[in-house]
């Protein structure tokens, strides 16, 4: 009888705050971390009776990385719009000519489930290739009942196909469905009364998100959707304070939001309300870069008041066409002046909090699922120093090496 399934020795690791630890051992049993800590404190029975053991030679082991904000499922792309933007055409003019988000909506509606899988699976596999073991995927390019459900179904299937843990987020409130043009309130009513309950009844939704902004949904409409989610016992998230300060972060915090995302225009009141609600700030440097934004999220304020900060790709065709969480880590250091430990925590522990999964994943602690990444480096700073490099040496999901 073996005391454990896998014993990892002579490793460097990081703690939940992102600080590096040396001479560490990790014990894996039945897909979870049985024990972890300094190797000189390793209980003898694990050392004597391990089914398998690996000498890591001082190389870094992190928790499996977590991309906690993506719009990964969609059809087509918007490269033609990128060309127009470079020629000086405004986003408003692009939208008036049929471009923008509604062009992605049309392409996504036109695609079958199989076509969506064919186009989206490579994006998920690209994240997996960087050591990402958990991904949040939003709907929001269907904007009607049939196609929002289709997107959520595809997201679930992608997780099974890729061997990646997928959490789904219903983002029907991404934009107003074209059938409801000029009547956003009727769309919100339909979303709350028909779309969201259907997604819940089919077990397709884990969380609910709203894009609360002057160009999207009002505070009153966001609250209506949050209340509908609460009535269905679904946790909420919010695209908040990206383009202006509407007070969306305070509203979301009042409903116990797991996270508020973007936050370039967050003020102190919103940050304090987020602290009280234990709400995570999800920062999205890819969108900041691609949109050439000038206003940075208030990282110093978030630090001062104690809001946990996560980082994600925001992978989407309109404002962050990337599948590299490693690149986002480097960008967060350079653009947002985040420290290396902050960034490492942001894509592990804080990202798990943003998904409400911190009891199971996000840090190397006894009792948690054994999602781990072994890197061919010894200094954790290298993960932020390089651009989208190095790739993992090996990745473990639930106690099994998958690469």
Swiss-Prot record:
Binds 1 zinc or iron ion per subunit. It catalyses: 4-imidazolone-5-propanoate + H2O = N-formimidoyl-L-glutamate. Keywords: Cytoplasm, Histidine metabolism, Hydrolase, Iron, Metal-binding, Zinc. Pathway: Amino-acid degradation; L-histidine degradation into L-glutamate; N-formimidoyl-L-glutamate from L-histidine: step 3/3. CDD domains: Imidazolone-5PH (cd01296). Its cofactor is Zn(2+); Fe(3+). GO terms for molecular function: imidazolonepropionase activity; iron ion binding; zinc ion binding. Zn(2+) binds at residues 69, 71, 239, 314. It is an enzyme of class 3 (hydrolase). The keyword Ribosomal protein does not apply. SUPFAM superfamilies: Composite domain of metallo-dependent hydrolases, Metallo-dependent hydrolases. N-formimidoyl-L-glutamate binds at residues 141, 316, 318. Its EC number is 3.5.2.7. 4-imidazolone-5-propanoate binds at residues 78, 141, 174, 242, 319. It comes from the Bacteria. It is found in: Cytoplasm. InterPro entries: Amidohydro-rel (IPR006680), HutI (IPR005920), Metal-dep_hydrolase_composite (IPR011059), Metal_Hydrolase (IPR032466). Its main location: cytoplasm. The keyword Transmembrane does not apply. GO terms for cellular component: cytoplasm. Fe(3+) binds at residues 69, 71, 239, 314. PANTHER family: IMIDAZOLONEPROPIONASE, IMIDAZOLONEPROPIONASE-RELATED. Belongs to the metallo-dependent hydrolases superfamily. HutI family. This is Imidazolonepropionase. The lineage of its organism: Bacteria, Pseudomonadati, Pseudomonadota, Gammaproteobacteria, Legionellales.
């Amino acid at each position: 009888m073996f005391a454990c399934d896998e014993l990892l020795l002579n490793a460097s690791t990081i703690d939940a705050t992102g600080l590096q630890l040396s001479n560490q051992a990790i014990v894996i049993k039945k897909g979870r971390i049985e024990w972890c800590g300094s190797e000189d404190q390793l209980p003898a029975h694990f050392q004597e009776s391990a089914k398998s053991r690996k000498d890591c030679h001082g190389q870094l082991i992190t928790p499996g990385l977590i991309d906690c904000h993506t719009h990964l499922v969609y059809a087509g792309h918007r490269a033609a719009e990128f060309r127009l933007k470079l020629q000086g055409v405004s986003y408003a003019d692009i939208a008036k000519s049929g471009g923008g988000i509604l062009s992605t909506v049309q392409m996504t509606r036109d695609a079958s489930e199989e076509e969506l899988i064919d186009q989206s699976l490579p994006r998920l596999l690209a994240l997996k290739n960087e050591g990402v073991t958990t991904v949040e995927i939003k709907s929001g390019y269907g904007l009607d009942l049939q196609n929002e459900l289709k997107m959520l179904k595809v997201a679930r299937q992608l997780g099974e196909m890729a061997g990646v843990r997928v959490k789904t987020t219903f983002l029907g409130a991404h934009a107003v469905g074209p059938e409801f043009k000029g009547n956003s309130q009727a769309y919100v009513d339909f979303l709350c009364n028909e779309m969201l309950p259907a997604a819940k009844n089919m077990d397709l939704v884990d969380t609910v998100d709203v894009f609360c902004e002057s160009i999207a949904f009002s505070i009153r409409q966001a609250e209506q959707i949050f209340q509908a989610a609460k009535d269905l016992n679904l946790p909420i998230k919010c695209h908040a304070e990206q383009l202006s300060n509407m007070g969306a972060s305070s509203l979301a915090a009042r409903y116990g939001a797991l996270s508020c995302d973007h936050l370039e225009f967050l003020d102190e009141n919103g940050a304090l309300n987020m602290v009280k609600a234990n709400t995570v700030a999800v920062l999205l440097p890819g969108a900041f870069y691609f949109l050439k934004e000038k206003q940075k999220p208030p990282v110093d304020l978030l630090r001062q008041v104690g809001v946990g900060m996560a980082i994600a790709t925001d992978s989407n065709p309109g404002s962050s066409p990337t599948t590299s969480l490693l690149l986002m880590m480097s960008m967060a250091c350079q653009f947002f002046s985040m420290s290396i430990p902050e960034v490492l925590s942001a894509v592990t522990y804080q990202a798990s909090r943003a998904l409400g999964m911190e009891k199971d994943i996000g840090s190397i602690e006894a009792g948690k699922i054994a999602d781990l990444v072994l890197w061919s480096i010894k200094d954790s700073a290298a993960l932020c120093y390089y651009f989208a490099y190095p790739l993992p040496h090996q990745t473990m999901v639930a106690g099994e090496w998958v690469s």
